[in-house]
Amino acid sequence: MKVVFLEDVKGRGKKGEIKEVPDGYANNFLIKNKKAEPATGKNLGAVKGRQKAEEKAAAEALAEAEQLKAKMADEKFVVEVKGKSGADGRLFGAISTKQIVVALAAQKQIKLDKRKLLLNQPIHALGYTNVPVKLHRDVVANLRVHVSEG
């Protein structure tokens, strides 16, 4: 029996795939547990429509990420973060990804998840720092962060 997988099934198929499986397995496990549906004309059309919608959404997300990367590449695109520091220019604490994301949202109206910032360790010094930001699976941008005395 040909079925269209609605979700990934280990060892059998991935979501959206159309495969031939034994009748008993299809009826008693896959269809019963809503992991697959029979590959009829109506179901195939629905799967194709879902795949097109997913591809369109992925393309839009990629285009949006590319646009944001271009905006961040501008020299004037700098996020200002203030911190207390000593005489030698070292901070009394550190600037974390959370502080950078909050400043980015306040100053540039761009909301990002703090896990998107690929900062190995918090910033401990005054001055400019380039922070890599993973905007999309295929798009990584550099965000300039200026830490100043505050």
From Swiss-Prot:
Keywords: Ribonucleoprotein, Ribosomal protein, RNA-binding, rRNA-binding. GO terms for biological process: translation. GO terms for molecular function: rRNA binding; structural constituent of ribosome. The keyword Transmembrane helix does not apply. The keyword Transmembrane does not apply. GO terms for cellular component: ribonucleoprotein complex; ribosome. PANTHER family: 50S RIBOSOMAL PROTEIN L9. HAMAP family: Ribosomal_bL9. Belongs to the bacterial ribosomal protein bL9 family. NCBIfam families: L9. Binds to the 23S rRNA. This is Large ribosomal subunit protein bL9. It comes from Leuconostoc citreum (strain KM20).
